[in-house]
Amino acid sequence: MHLFISSVINKNRRLKKMFFSVPVPKNESVLSYAPGSSERDNLVRAIADLSKEIIEIPSIINGKEVFTGSTAYCIEPHNHQNKLAIYHKAGQKEIDLAIQSALAAHKEWENMPFYHRSAIFLKAAELLSTKYRFLLNAATMLGQSKNIHQAEIDSACELIDFWRYNTYYAQKIYEQQPLVSPKGEWNFTEYRSLEGFVFAITPFNFTSISGNLPSSPALMGNTVVWKPASTAVYSGYMIMKILQESGLPDGVINFIPGSGEEIGDIITNSPHLAGIHFTGSTKVFNHIWQCVGENIHIYKSYPRIVGETGGKNFIFAHSSADIKALAVACVRGAFEYQGQKCSAASRVYIPDNLYPEWLKEMKEILSTVTVGDVRDFSHFVNAVIDKNSFDRIKSYIESAQSSSEAEIIYGGSYDDSVGYFIEPTLIKTTNPHFTTMQEEIFGPVLTIYVYPSSKFEETLKICDSTSCYGLTGSIFAQDRQAIFLAYEMLRHSAGNFYINDKPTGAVVGQQPFGGGRASGTNDKAGSALNLQRWISARSIKETFVPAENYRYPFMD
């Protein structure tokens, strides 16, 4: 009898989802941090506090801190002699334990009413908006070398928006029920979590994505194993602590820093893998698909694979473009956060009649841009994330310098003696298929192709076919017919397409983010489209008065 009652209670918990409404979300306001403002003073204090000590970061498995003894350092990219933390890397034992913990926590978490799951993430948003705003911003600035504005729009505003909007979109999903229940029947849909656990693999470049990738599947009733980027463990650990303080039950999200290859290989060999939520390089994502494909016969269910990967994002100017607006978009789109945004502009197409004036405008703006430590708030550009990134970006600059098809027309300097600093660099090429027009660089490098203004349509075709990616892109024009032509011809060139604006800065609730082709599965983070990937619908029909005769009227 006890088991029967327990079963009924659990069933009712799952069905009793919509006797409430979550608060209607609004985008978190972006603070200015202007000189003399209280937020600026608070942030300066937070930076000073975090700079005082090197903290120790464990794995967090089933709510418990796990210190493995296999360690690495979190360093400041802008001053690589400064250590922020020492973190403990998960090995085979810890990875297996994280999987077991996620599986053990799954039933109770899935059965928790949606109201209570939502409340946890709404509380996390409130804590981040108030108590932890400046600490997480400071952690992102120091650990990932973001300037004050880039940290604010990322680790504060966007993550708060993810947590608030996700609960709202989830409610809208649960509200979707069959339109028809004929007389004597009741049709309804139950939205179940996936059977197994979800593996979240998060990047270094957006703290908000680090928080969203594990929490969005969790909101929908899934339990998660989370591997943060090794260069963003510092801010990731702080997010995990915020979620714990918000009431997240033990085992729902398990935080395991460590080797991506080792953790990934163990995870993809688990028969209980139900899904993967990924942001990172196309190369790594392809490897994940390959591993899943090779193991497809062992899984209990086909894993849901959701990924946002690389980009070779473009700005395309028509001869009717506003030159000042175009130049500002190029500087912000290409060089904010050192070009390390998935959406960053990396190639630009300029008509020959605009090029001289555009270049003059670019040089005037860039002459005022400074590069340096995040503690100096006057810098627009800071350091790239690590030595590997520095060397890779430098190799593209050196390749352009030695090529007969390209020339450096601005910048080109770099120095890693203190931090991993690379000057904003403009490369002009005569070949629209030049290497730096095709391959993702992920650094402060923008390549320009000057095209004959009479060949607008032909150059649009080149833009569409040059790169394997399809993430973001912009068209700059005042001529509406030109805008329409670009809109149509570049339909699959960008999952986020901007008209007279830079191709970066998607806002939750306004421009759901993601792209196709080699840029990912285009499941649009920050929207219901993404949340739907983390549920498995069950259609249920109840007949109140069942048929008592097998025969149909035509048989008489």
Write out the residue ranges for each language-model feature.
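Hydrophobic face of amphipathic alpha-helices that form TPR/SEL1-like repeat modules
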Residues: 9-84
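Short beta-alpha connecting loops at secondary-structure transitions
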Residues: 183, 224-227, 312-316, 343-347, ...
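Conserved C-terminal structural/oligomerization subdomain of aldehyde/semialdehyde dehydrogenase
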Residues: 12-21, 28, 32, 78-87, ...
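Rossmann-like NAD(P) dinucleotide-binding subdomain of oxidoreductase/dehydrogenase enzymes
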Residues: 141, 145, 170-325, 522
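Glycine-rich loop-to-alpha-helix module at the N-terminal edge of alpha/beta enzyme cores
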Residues: 68-69, 73-76, 81-174, 460, ...
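ALDH superfamily catalytic-core signature
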Residues: 242-247, 269-270, 275, 283-432, ...
